[in-house]
Amino acid sequence: MTSSCRTSKHSGTTTVQLPALDTDRKTSRALVKRRVQVLIVGLGPAGTACGMELAKSGLDVLAIDRAHFPRDKICGDALTGDALRFLRENNIPSKIIQRSFGETRKPCYAELTHTLAEASGYSLQGTALRQKTASFQSIRRIDLDNWLVESCAKAGLPMEFGWQMQSLHRLSASDPWCVAGTIRSRKRKVQERFEVTAEVVVGCDGVSSVVQNLTREQHAPRPIALASRRYSRRDEVENPDVSLMDYQWPRNPSYAWRFSVTGGTNAGIYWCHHRDIPPLSGRDLLALTRLHAPRGDAIRTWGIPVLTEDLLPQSPSGILLTGDAASLVDPMIGHGIDRAIHSGELAGQILSKGFQTGCTVEQITRTYENNLDCRRVEWQRSFKGMDNMLGGIDRTAEQFAISLLRSVMLPSTTQP
């Protein structure tokens, strides 16, 4: 099979399209019933990472998604090292990953000198530090998620598309979960209904997780950060080969971004959720986005349930939450896709080992949550860093200058 190109109807932006899967079901009037050991709800990075693990486990698994692929997903599209490692281990085609020159702009960088910047491999562009090598990497989510689903299909993972979960219940704590919903065609027409009985349901269904909302008795308020996204063609922007993070607002970790992607750029605003940052209205978010990216496709916005130091309520037995559904995102330092992958992979590994070694569903659930909580503690450090910055403890430019001086002085001080 060969890949082809598709063009956005809004801007003409070219993206790579992998072979589309035949995800439409044949029309049927009967209720579709299934019984499995594990049901994965959502086939983004978390659900597909979980599915890849379980496809080789021998367990009876089904993965569903309300969409038909390929489909777009609002995202900044940036890839961290951990995400890249997973993708390369699974042989992602290099042509759908974009490389560019990373650039960070902060008002405090006015204190730096060209000599200090050059000493650490950067060039100083006004108040911005730009990498000298094209090491910033990104991928459009429509390409990433379609490739991940294609990989799951090749691995033999049973999947259904157009299946939208609407209810989830069980008779008692010792009974399996029953998930029900509607099946829609690519044109969004309801064709039939489904009912799946599963011992474990893995919630990989993102920001507005239905699995999370229907199973957690305590609905503690989750901090929501705001973000926007606008795709533009290469001829609509300056420096399309530079991926910029622009911290425009003093004593505020919010930032504007413009990341290079195949065929153009992904630009947007991340507005911080922190208690000491004034809230931003949706109208103001759109206005800031237009100012930052005057030309391009329609602007899309979303809320991000972000990682904080607050503990999340325990899930009931047989419910494993991953990625955005578990509030693991840290937009401050770009961690979204990688944490979705990590938590999905972790869920798959623990489910595979747990069922194969005769663990109970309760034991599997708590083992997953305990393992994820250990990682969560490590990931929460950036929240403390935000507190330090807003409290005036952090001196970014000063610390950067000191580290650069140390890197310059170190060779001479270590000579015999």
Residue ranges of predicted features:
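Beta1/beta-strand and adjacent pyrophosphate-binding region of the FAD-binding site
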Residues: R29-A46
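Glycine-rich FAD pyrophosphate-binding loop
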Residues: L39, A55-C75
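Conserved Rossmann-like nucleotide-cofactor binding loop
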Residues: A46, F69, S208
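Conserved N-terminal glycine-rich FAD pyrophosphate-binding loop of Rossmann-like flavoproteins
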Residues: H68-R88
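A conserved beta-strand/loop capping segment in the N-terminal third of enzymes
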Residues: L84-N146
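Predominantly flavin-linked oxidoreductase catalytic cores and closely associated redox partners
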Residues: S151-R295, L311
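FAD/FMN-dependent oxidoreductases across multiple families
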Residues: Q166-S167, H273-I350, Q356-C359
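C-terminal helical "tail/cap" subdomain of flavin- and related membrane-associated enzymes
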Residues: Q349-P416
